[in-house]
Amino acid sequence: MDCNRMVIMNSVNEETYYFGQRKLAWFAGSMKKDYIEAGSWDDKAKAVPYSVYREFALNPAPIGKTLGISEKGDPIWVDIPPKTKHQLITEAEDKKSGLMQGAREVISPLQDAIDLEMATQEETQKLTAWKRYRVLLNRLDTSNAPDIDWPKKPE
């Protein structure tokens, strides 16, 4: 659909919507002056029919898709690009950090019980299992993401 010639008002609120081609963003026409003053207006923004705004701005993207732009400058759904190696490594580092924090939270009171000579046999065994898990986590090389063999969390 070519949106260049179509400006349709929303019959409910009479608003004109714009699709920002450079920023892949949506703008309410009633706030155009504010966007310009704030320096956030997309100079390639174009008015779109409300049906286009509704489809692309008010509904979630289909699974595996993200907002993109057609050759004519209209919004379209495009395939989500595969994650970069850097993104995969960052995700693995974040996961590792979260798992390490979780292990610390479990280990701390168990270690307190040992230190105060109050630990049960079960607590001693749990502490050993959780410390082993934490060591294995710490040894993980996140640069191998996404091919990481994550250790199994103790029960």
Curated annotation (Swiss-Prot):
Pfam families: Caudo_TAP (PF02413). Chaperone involved in tail fiber assembly. This is Probable tail fiber assembly protein. The lineage of its organism: Viruses, Duplodnaviria, Heunggongvirae, Uroviricota, Caudoviricetes. Belongs to the tfa family. Keywords: Chaperone, Viral release from host cell, Viral tail assembly, Viral tail fiber assembly. GO terms for biological process: virus tail fiber assembly. The keyword Chaperone applies. PANTHER family: PROPHAGE TAIL FIBER ASSEMBLY PROTEIN HOMOLOG TFAE-RELATED, PROPHAGE TAIL FIBER ASSEMBLY PROTEIN HOMOLOG TFAE-RELATED-RELATED.
